Regions:
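Conserved active-site alpha-helix within GNAT-family acetyltransferase domains
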Residues: 93, 97, 109, 122-140
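Conserved beta-strand segments that form the floor/walls of ligand-binding pockets within enzyme
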Residues: 55, 67, 81-85, 94, ...
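Compositionally biased, non-globular sequence tracts
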Residues: 17, 26, 103, 111-113
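A short beta-loop-alpha structural element at the N-terminal edge
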Residues: 4-18
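Conserved GNAT acetyl-CoA-binding A-motif
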Residues: 107-119
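Acetyl-CoA-dependent GNAT
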Residues: 7-11, 23, 29-89, 100-102, ...
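Terminal substrate-recognition subdomain of acyl/acetyltransferases
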Residues: 151-162
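Conserved catalytic-core motifs of GNAT/GCN5-like acyltransferases
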Residues: 117-120, 132, 137-153
Length: 162
């Protein structure tokens, strides 16, 4: 398996859109069904400072994505927020772990980020386990955090500090 974690390129945008068009990736994120290519092009062709979009490429195909966003407030520049998705067909193969390793390396060894935050639905045990494996702890739970498939879902706030 030749897995590469790298910064995204503009030609990755259709593959990133396809990741979030998958049922599991949609259910685990805040993305809406049927994501448009135009929306993803707008989002990823105008990446602001402090945002580092990463992709996981397996044998030439983009199969995962992680957004790493450093807080804009000067008093919180030591904090980053992450969100990630892995194509349904490639879940359970270590893609999420590889993306997380790269994000932590970027945070701690290059950007002086000492706190990484994320939000995860409480009914996503695989993602919660992944984050806990990398030292994330649940700091709280938001009731009715999002609306998905006709009902409200709760989410955990998780963070990792060094």
């Amino acid at each position: 398996m030749s897995l590469i974690i790298r910064q995204y390129h503009a030609d990755d945008i259709p593959a990133i859109r396809d990741i979030y068009a998958q049922p599991k990736a949609q259910a685990g994120t805040l993305q809406l069904p049927m994501p448009s290519l135009a929306m993803w092009e707008k989002r990823l062709n105008n990446v602001p400072d402090g945002v580092y979009p990463l992709v996981a490429e397996l044998e030439g195909k983009v199969v995962g994505n992680l957004g790493f966003v450093i807080a804009a407030n000067p008093r919180r520049r030591h904090v980053a927020d992450i969100g990630m998705g892995v194509h349904d067909a490639y879940q359970g193969r270590g893609i999420g772990s590889a993306l997380m390793e790269k994000a932590i390396d970027l945070a701690e060894n290059w950007l002086n980020v000492s706190r990484i935050e994320l939000t995860v639905y409480t009914d996503n045990p695989a993602a919660i386990h992944l984050y806990q494996k990398f030292g994330f702890e649940i700091e709280g739970t938001a009731k009715q955090f999002a609306f998905r498939n006709g009902e409200f879902v709760d989410a955990h706030y998780m963070a990792r500090t060094r």
